[in-house]
Amino acid sequence: MTATWEKKEGNEGLLTVTVPAEKVNKALDQAFKKVVKQINVPGFRKGKVPRPIFEQRFGVEALYQDAIDILLPDAYGEAIDETDIKPVAQPEVSVTQIEKGKDFIFEATVTVEPEVKLGDYKGLEIEKQETELSDDELQEAIDHSLGHLAEMVVKEDGVVENGDTVNIDFSGSVDGEEFEGGQAEGYDLEIGSGSFIPGFEEQLEGMKVDEEKDVVVTFPEEYHAEELAGKEATFKTKVNEIKFKEVPELTDEIANELDAEANTVDEYKENLRKRLAEQKATDAENVEKEEAITKATDNTTIDIPEAMVNTELDRMVSEFAQRIQQQGLDLQTYFQISGQDESQLREQMKDDAEQRVKTNLTLTAIAEAEKIEATDEDIDKELEKMSKQFNISVEDIKNTLGNTDIIKNDVRIQKVIDLLRDNAKFVEGTKED
């Protein structure tokens, strides 16, 4: 077999492949064995017609398409290896010759990975992130944890305040006419949650139980119900009940409830500070890495093939479908609710898809330029890490994946990202840890 590659404009080229006649004849033999089982010829049992009779009656041409189907996949794969090209989409194939006793010749128009022209990726200026945990951040985390233990208590006296949960009846109207979905009784609303039309919750502050009030608001211009968008509405509102969160005091007992390894408040704070500091350092490093990746990608010049963007869009739509499935929705239901279709969703995702493709190509090109590879030791460490994280044996992970190619590539790219950050110049007058 011989193959030649002729580069064309952009990211396309013409692959011309010639398969020797002897392979063609073998493929025709295989094709005959397949086809003869499916035909009936008077005077012969089904599947027993001799080859000469078959060709006399139907012509050898009746075997050509099956022979092509047999020859093409292997021939195309070998041609890719021989010419060392990297296709990014299915080729457009045109058969130029298929005939008994002659070579099989076909041409394939192939879209290949684009040329990546790297810009600066070392010495990038990135902002050094704060890693020191403040006392305020620690207290905020403590308050947040205590908030989960809070109990809702009825406010016997007093007025509605931000953070309270009020039980209300309301009836909304526009131009004196009630509208669908604008009425409810016994509705619980947390003041400050932002779950109602802007301005509604704030107007309830200061009200007392059994008090009634006309709450006047204006629907946002981008409101999902077009007939209400931008219009002023009046909600006749009555407060039935007011509840507030009663947050427990941090005691040794509560500290142990929040952290089984802490027996005192001080131990709880110490453990929490350590965890938060570690997380803040990790988050800071990730932000710095993301900035380095973005700048390295921005400095790279690539003519991205549309086929690669479409492949990434397919992946993103699939990921989106999985996410909404966890919320009990399928794509078609989502489209009905949102008023979108798949083409509109893909259009919304297109910029992100292009950026993903460009980033992946950039990081891969840097790995090649720097001769970065994942060693067996690197892969073993990553497998051990995954084993601990998901509580699965290394062998089970290997069996699930089939091979370690995905892990190998992930580790390789992570090494590139580390290189970008390690070689960056940190600004804002701070220094790297």
Swiss-Prot record:
Entry's free-text remark on domains: Consists of 3 domains; the N-terminus binds the ribosome, the middle domain has PPIase activity, while the C-terminus has intrinsic chaperone activity on its own.
Keyword Phosphoprotein on entry: no
Main subcellular localisation: cytoplasm
Cellular localisation: Cytoplasm
Family as reported in the entry's similarity comment: Belongs to the FKBP-type PPIase family. Tig subfamily.
Enzyme class: isomerase
Lineage: superkingdom: Bacteria
GO MF term set: peptidyl-prolyl cis-trans isomerase activity; protein folding chaperone; ribosome binding
Cross-referenced PANTHER family: TRIGGER FACTOR CHAPERONE AND PEPTIDYL-PROLYL CIS/TRANS ISOMERASE, TRIGGER FACTOR-LIKE PROTEIN TIG, CHLOROPLASTIC
SUPFAM superfamilies named among the record's database cross-references: FKBP-like, Triger factor/SurA peptide-binding domain-like, Trigger factor ribosome-binding domain
Protein's UniProt name: Trigger factor
Xref: Pfam families: FKBP_C (PF00254), Trigger_C (PF05698), Trigger_N (PF05697)
Domain PPIase FKBP-type: residue ranges: 163-248
Keyword annotations from UniProtKB, A to Z: Cell cycle, Cell division, Chaperone, Cytoplasm, Isomerase, Rotamase
Annotated function: Involved in protein export. Acts as a chaperone by maintaining the newly synthesized protein in an open conformation. Functions as a peptidyl-prolyl cis-trans isomerase.
The reaction(s) this protein catalyses: [protein]-peptidylproline (omega=180) = [protein]-peptidylproline (omega=0)
GO biological process assignments: 'de novo' cotranslational protein folding; cell division; chaperone-mediated protein folding; protein transport; protein unfolding
Record carries keyword Manganese: no
One GO cellular component term noted in the UniProt record for this chain: cytoplasm
The EC number(s) this enzyme carries: 5.2.1.8
Gene label: tig
